[in-house]
Amino acid sequence: MRRWSWVVDALLIAGCAAVAALLKQDANWDQLQYHYWYPWQLFHGGFTDPDLYGGRFQNPLPQVPFYLLTSLHPVAAQAALGALAGVAAVVTRRIAVRVLDGGLATSTAAALLAVVGAGFRSELGTSYSDVLLAAMLLGGLLLVLREQPLLAGLLAGAAVGLKYTSAPFALALLLALLVVRWRGLLWWVIGAAVGWVVTGGAWAWQLWRTYDSPVFPFWNTVFGSPWFPASNLTDERYGVAGLQGWLHWPWDMARGTARVLDLPVRDPRWLILLAALVLIAAGARRMTRSGWAVLVFTMSGLVLWLAVFGVIRYAIPGEMAAAVVIVMALRLWCSDRVTTALTLALAVVTGVLTTSAASRRVEFGTSWYVVEPGAFARVQSGDAVLVDGQYPSTFLLPGNLPTDVTVHVVQKDFTPTPMRDWLLRDLAGARQVWVVTGRPPSQVDPTIGTIDYDNCSRIR
């Protein structure tokens, strides 16, 4: 049975890789603006501050796998991205094995129900790193179930160090640990601290040294950086508001009206999760400690996520664990065979009804990026380049500018801050200032004045 278990895991990874390779090449907005640019800067001498752009303040390490994979042929690179996402499916199946009194088929069906979710499908074969962080957090849950709190904390802390959006499910891991083995709390905390230092400590120090805050520009009411107003910088476009919003959210997700992304997203599995909770409540006496731990992780993580962020990409750990909860609820009342059949039916039906965020894709080429030769030939040493934050274009720059040219990305959210004066002081010493933008008006305009768009040239 163990041999077949490894075979199924390999097939899950291979299946995700194959699906990713069959899609067109990922060209999502965030990738073109900062998923490639900031890792490139990381490997080529560091950052040119100030950047008046939110992506600058995120740890670039989660994007390094994508950056390195772009050296491959685009089809191979995207297949590799799909394979990395498949790790989350494998870990989900392993969690199901721990909590379900069933065979290989039931746990595999749980993994299939997990991968048809809107969040996972939105990130499959893309440059987004949230699915990789989900694999780490789900791995932490698996380690909690195996009563290995030190390693579980290590993965949780590392995920938070890479991206603070992992925090809700890292805290959910802690609650799950209290269900399984509360005496392991100290070891979990030690592991989490070490994990955060390893992946996020250097980045926090870099932000502190440059912007006087280890989490700049977030939580500035606490850290008081002089470069940003004293606010906590929350995005109110997403999530829920008021009791009615909380109660309606599963139904809104099923209808596709929930505010979880800029693109339409629909996932009926959230309504099914509510039904699963009813089944679990009715059969609570037959629940195992491991089952309660998975339930606590899923529900507490989802509540924290929805209260703080509400962006579906950040909920992938809970989205995938929810599949295990649904199968767990069925298994309380049905045989192993019936549970497997019902789970597969749910995976097919919900997979058809689910709408994932269809980000921009283009036809595959011979390399991941192809920039028109000579597009930046007029830029010379000592110049400065400003990139409009509302038009994704930093991917055009790597390797196409003189090494001593400074590049600054400008976003309107940061132009009313003291960072604008810092930028203007730096630009005063530039031989010439160039702007990379789309059609006017540009977000650079409020910083340096209106641009003479009539004399601009097109870059491909």
Regions found by a protein language model. Give the residues of each.
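Transmembrane-helix signature of polytopic, membrane-embedded enzymes
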Residues: 90-118, 135, 151, 289-292
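Signature aromatic-anchored transmembrane alpha helix within multi-pass, membrane-resident enzymes
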Residues: 150-154, 174, 189-197, 324-361
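Short hydrophobic/aromatic helix or loop-helix immediately within or flanking a transmembrane segment
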Residues: 37-38, 42, 53-75, 247-253
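Short acidic/glycine- and proline-prone juxtamembrane loop motifs at membrane-interface regions
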Residues: 119-132
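Membrane-embedded, lumen/periplasm-facing catalytic core of multi-pass transferases
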Residues: 35, 346-407
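Hydrophobic, aromatic-rich transmembrane alpha-helices
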Residues: 2, 85-97, 251-289
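Membrane-lumen/periplasm interface segments of specific transmembrane helices
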Residues: 188-255
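Hydrophobic/aromatic-rich transmembrane helices and adjacent perimembrane loops
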Residues: 35-40, 130-136, 159-164, 168, ...
